[in-house]
């Protein structure tokens, strides 16, 4: 499956963001995490 890049909308309960990204519960999009 394709992963979701930065600023892509996402579901925090089913996080499909790319590696190094995390789905923000507040904003509902993929944010970069260090």
Swiss-Prot record:
Pfam families per UniProt = Toxin_12
Name of the protein described by the UniProt record: Mu-theraphotoxin-CCy1a
Where does the source fall among the domains of life?
Eukaryota
| Keywords recorded for this protein, A-Z | Disulfide bond, Ion channel impairing toxin, Knottin, Neurotoxin, Secreted, Toxin, Voltage-gated sodium channel impairing toxin
Compartment(s) of residence: Secreted
Entry annotated with the keyword Secreted:
yes
Q: What is its main location?
A: secreted
Biological function? Voltage-gated sodium channel Nav1.7/SCN9A inhibitor.
The reply on keyword Phosphoprotein is no
Show the GO cellular component annotation of the record: extracellular region
Q: Which InterPro entries match?
A: Huwentoxin-1 (IPR011696), Huwentoxin_CS1 (IPR013140)
Q: In which tissues is it expressed?
A: Expressed by the venom gland.
Disulfide bridge partners, by residue number: 3-18, 10-23, 17-30
| Family assignment from sequence similarity | Belongs to the neurotoxin 10 (Hwtx-1) family. 14 (Hntx-1) subfamily.
**What are the protein's GO molecular function terms?**
ion channel inhibitor activity; sodium channel regulator activity; toxin activity
- Entry's free-text remark on domains: The presence of a 'disulfide through disulfide knot' structurally defines this protein as a knottin.
């Amino acid at each position: 499956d394709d992963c979701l890049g930065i600023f892509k909308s996402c579901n925090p309960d089913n996080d499909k963001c790319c590696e190094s990204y995390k789905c923000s519960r507040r904003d509902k999009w993929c944010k970069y995490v260090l």
